[in-house]
């Protein structure tokens, strides 16, 4: 086996569909509703592991988990007019109960700012109760009219983590935005997923937000995918829903809010970014199975049984040390067939144990990411596997960051930017004066989408690619999902 990444990069869509199906992560396209898939047991365990990282980081920073109803009345959803305009073409509506028409249409939750603010209005009365941080992990529904894609563009987003916070002042809410950004950085670092962090321009903010900050990553085909967003909502939703609190000075005022979300796309990025032509390479931090033991049969039945017994013993040693391990005891498949199966599942480490290892009380270790191998004594296997898992995690992270950085280009000419994007460059940064008019023109001329501009100050000694005035920053442009 050699490491190749041709199919992974040049035919990514086919590669991704193949991995989800053959790796038994997610069955998509066969459930009889467009844009909805089924999490299979192996993929569901990966999903659980990723959710666990998210949940632990939120819980440890004072967030409290809640669970809201799926249905939102139309009159409530429309209370924040900018918000509903941003979603009205994407809402699924329930219009009947049994055979009777409903008096008020009910929306399948597209997001929960309005619903949660409604209840916060009942629960929170004073600055003494603030800050308040809620979150839930639920399904949301969007009536996508574009071509749907498994995990990437869905009508039911099954893993939507949405956090909603309430604060006395604008500055308090801004500090929460900064905390949320740091939480997301930790999440993506745990997943070994690289990103660029941008502030979305005014014409592409979340509906009803004052500011939107987005995490984007570059997929194998050069297209960019949004993997997380953080929104400073100001008083827009509290004002629309007449939600007031008593402030420290005794006055009543609308509190300031934030919201931030992560979806199935984070899981898609974990599967996609660390892959090769043989399948995904799951980071050990979230891999459902960290080690697979593949017994190599002996020339006789008795020898094969002894190899199997030794293989099971090694696997039990690892499991007792909290290293998730399985032994592939399928007698109908050859070792080569088993290698194929576990490679497409992205298991980080394979142990091969045959008569030679049995006779010498050793174990043969094979890394999935770079194919390096080691032979270690039985008593050393636990420590060596732990060491190798840590190395794989760090190497995947480094490789992914290096790849992302290599796919960010700078162009001070609009034609150059367009050509780079047409050749799957990834992200192109162009000098920009800061005006909406020029930003929209950049989108039009490059036939791409503006991601936003860096949140840190970026001095640009150049001219805007459109108006030729002095540039204030760079604008990031990409082909996107």
UniProtKB/Swiss-Prot annotation:
It comes from the Archaea. SMART domains: ProRS-C_1. It catalyses: tRNA(Pro) + L-proline + ATP = L-prolyl-tRNA(Pro) + AMP + diphosphate. One of its GO terms (biological process) is prolyl-tRNA aminoacylation. The keyword Transmembrane helix does not apply. InterPro entries: aa-tRNA-synt_IIb (IPR002314), aa-tRNA-synth_II (IPR006195), aa-tRNA-synth_II/BPL/LPL (IPR045864), Anticodon-bd (IPR004154), Anticodon-bd_dom_sf (IPR036621), Pro-tRNA-ligase_IIa (IPR002316), Pro-tRNA-ligase_IIa_arc-type (IPR004499), Pro-tRNA_ligase_II_C (IPR016061). Catalyzes the attachment of proline to tRNA(Pro) in a two-step reaction: proline is first activated by ATP to form Pro-AMP and then transferred to the acceptor end of tRNA(Pro). Belongs to the class-II aminoacyl-tRNA synthetase family. ProS type 3 subfamily. Consists of three domains: the N-terminal catalytic domain, the anticodon-binding domain and the C-terminal extension. Homodimer. This is Proline--tRNA ligase. It comes from Saccharolobus islandicus (strain M.14.25 / Kamchatka #1).
């Amino acid at each position: 086996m050699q490491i190749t990444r041709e199919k992974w990069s040049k035919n990514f869509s086919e590669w991704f569909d193949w991995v989800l199906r053959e790796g038994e992560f997610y069955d998509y396209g066969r459930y009889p509703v467009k844009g909805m898939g089924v999490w299979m047991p192996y993929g569901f365990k990966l999903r659980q592991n990723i959710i666990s990282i998210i949940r632990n980081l939120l819980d440890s920073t004072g967030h409290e988990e809640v669970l809201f109803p799926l249905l939102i009345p139309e009159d409530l959803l429309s209370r924040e007019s900018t918000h509903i305009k941003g979603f009205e073409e994407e809402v699924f509506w329930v219009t009947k109960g049994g055979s009777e028409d409903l008096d008020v249409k009910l929306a399948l939750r597209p997001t929960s700012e309005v619903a949660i603010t409604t209840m916060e209005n009942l629960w929170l009365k004073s600055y003494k109760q603030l800050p308040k941080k809620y979150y839930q992990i639920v399904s949301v529904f969007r009536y996508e009219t574009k071509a749907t894609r498994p995990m990437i563009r869905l009508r039911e987003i099954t893993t939507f983590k949405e956090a909603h916070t309430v604060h006395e002042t604008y500055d308090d809410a801004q500090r929460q935005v900064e905390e949320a950004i740091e939480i997301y950085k930790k999440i993506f670092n745990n997943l070994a997923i690289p990103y660029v962090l941008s502030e979305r321009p005014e014409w592409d903010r979340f509906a009803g937000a004052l500011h939107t900050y987005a995490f984007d990553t570059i997929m194998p085909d050069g297209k960019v995918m949004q993997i997380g967003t953080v929104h400073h909502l100001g008083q827009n939703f509290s004002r629309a829903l007449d939600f007031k609190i008593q402030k420290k000075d005794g006055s009543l005022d609308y509190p300031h809010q934030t919201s931030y979300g992560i979806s199935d796309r984070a899981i898609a990025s974990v599967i996609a970014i660390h892959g090769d032509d043989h399948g995904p390479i799951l980071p050990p931090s979230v891999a459902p199975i960290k080690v697979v033991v593949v017994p190599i049969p002996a020339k006789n039945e008795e020898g094969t049984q002894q190899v199997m017994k030794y293989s099971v013993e090694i696997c039990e040693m690892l499991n007792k040390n909290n290293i998730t391990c399985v032994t592939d005891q399928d007698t109908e498949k050859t070792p080569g067939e088993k290698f194929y199966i576990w490679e497409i599942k992205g298991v980080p480490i394979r142990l091969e144990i045959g008569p030679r290892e049995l006779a010498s009380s050793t174990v043969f270790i094979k890394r999935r990411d770079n194919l390096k191998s080691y032979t270690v004594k039985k008593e050393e296997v636990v420590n060596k596997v732990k060491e190798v898992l840590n190395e794989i995690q760090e190497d995947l992270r480094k490789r992914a960051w290096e790849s992302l950085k290599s796919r960010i280009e700078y162009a001070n000419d609009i034609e150059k930017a367009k050509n780079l994007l047409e050749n799957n460059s990834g992200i192109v940064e162009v000098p920009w004066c800061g005006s909406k008019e020029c930003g929209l023109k950049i989108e039009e001329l490059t036939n791409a989408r503006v991601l936003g501009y860096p949140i840190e100050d970026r001095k640009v000694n150049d001219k805007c690619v459109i108006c030729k005035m002095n540039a204030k920053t760079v604008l990031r442009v990409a082909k996107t999902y």
